[in-house]
């Protein structure tokens, strides 16, 4: 995401 959290590639907020 645009925020600095670790998330899967498909979660683009």
From Swiss-Prot:
It is found in: Secreted. GO terms for cellular component: extracellular region. GO terms for biological process: neuropeptide signaling pathway. The modification Phenylalanine amide is found at residue 13. It comes from the Eukaryota. Keywords: Amidation, Neuropeptide, Secreted. The keyword Ribonucleoprotein does not apply. The keyword Secreted applies. Belongs to the FARP (FMRFamide related peptide) family. This is FMRFamide-like neuropeptide AF11. It comes from Ascaris suum (Pig roundworm).
